[in-house]
C-alpha cells in the first residue's frame, strides 16, 4: 500500500484551537504527515492563516479579515474560544507554518479562501512564499474557486493543486483535467472505490475531507485514497500503522 498522507485539518483542531501554531505543532506530535490550513490576505497584504472570512468565531475580534492590518490582527486572542489555556495564541502567518515544517517532510495543503472575498494577488503571493522556502514539491494548493486553481497551475506548474467540492460531480477526474488539477478534494461521502480507480487511471488522486470517524477512515483507506483530511491525526495514524502491520 502506498503511503497515505495524514492531513491534520487546520492542524490538530480537535486538540487545539484551529489554525494556530499550537495546533500545527501538536499535529506533528500526533503523527500527521500533512497539515491542511486556510489562507487569506490582511488589509496590508500579509498571508494570514484563518478559516472564516470574519473574525468573531475564532478570535475576540469582529469584522472581516480583509479590513484589518496584520498589526491589528496580531493583537487578537485566537485561542481562548477553544480553552483558556490557549489565550496566548495569535493568528499565524503562512511563513510561520512553512518554517515549522521546512525540515520535517510534512506536506502542506494550503486552501485559498477566495470565494466570498476575491483577494487580488492571493495566488501570486502564496506561490512566491512557497518558492521562497523551496517547498514547492511538498505543497498542495486547494480551493473551491477553480478559476484560482487554474491560475495557480499556470503560474507554478510544479505545485500540485486540488479541486475542493462537495458531491455530485460527474467524473470529477475529467473535470480536474480541464483545470489542470492534480487532486480531488471531495467531501468524504462522495468518494467510492470505483471513483478512486477512475481517478487513478486519469493520473489523479483523492484527498477527501473532513473524516473523523474511524469506520469512515477505514473505508477510505480501503478505497485507495491518497490522503485523508481529519481533525484527529492521532486516530488516523493508528489506523494507518495497523494497516501497514497487517
What are these regions (language model features)?
Residues 1-246:
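Phosphate-group recognition and catalysis centered on beta-loop-alpha active-site segments
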Amino acid at each position: 500500500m502506498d503511503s497515505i498522507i495524514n492531513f491534520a485539518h487546520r492542524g490538530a483542531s480537535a486538540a487545539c484551537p484551529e489554525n494556530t501554531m499550537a495546533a500545527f505543532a501538536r499535529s506533528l506530535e500526533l503523527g500527521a504527515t500533512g497539515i491542511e490550513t486556510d489562507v487569506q490576505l490582511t488589509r496590508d497584504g500579509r498571508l494570514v492563516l484563518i478559516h472564516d472570512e470574519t473574525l468573531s468565531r475564532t478570535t475576540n475580534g469582529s469584522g472581516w479579515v480583509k479590513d484589518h492590518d496584520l498589526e491589528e490582527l496580531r493583537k487578537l486572542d485566537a485561542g481562548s474560544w477553544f480553552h483558556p489555556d490557549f489565550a496566548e495564541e495569535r493568528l499565524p502567518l503562512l511563513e510561520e507554518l512553512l518554517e515549522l515544517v521546512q525540515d520535517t517532510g510534512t506536506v502542506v495543503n494550503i486552501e485559498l479562501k477566495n470565494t466570498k472575498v476575491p483577494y487580488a494577488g492571493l495566488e501570486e503571493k502564496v506561490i512566491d512564499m512557497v518558492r521562497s522556502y523551496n517547498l514547492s514539491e511538498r505543497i498542495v494548493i486547494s480551493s473551491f474557486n477553480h478559476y484560482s486553481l487554474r491560475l495557480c497551475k499556470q503560474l507554478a506548474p510544479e505545485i500540485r493543486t486540488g479541486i475542493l467540492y462537495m458531491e455530485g460531480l460527474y467524473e470529477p477526474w475529467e473535470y480536474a483535467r480541464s483545470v489542470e488539477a492534480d487532486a480531488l478534494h471531495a467531501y468524504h461521502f462522495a468518494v467510492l472505490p470505483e471513483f478512486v480507480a477512475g481517478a487513478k487511471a486519469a493520473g489523479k488522486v483523492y484527498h477527501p475531507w473532513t473524516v473523523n470517524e474511524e469506520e469512515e477512515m477505514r473505508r477510505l483507506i480501503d478505497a485507495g485514497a491518497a490522503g485523508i483530511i481529519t481533525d484527529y491525526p492521532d486516530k488516523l495514524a493508528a489506523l494507518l500503522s495497523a494497516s501497514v502491520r497487517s
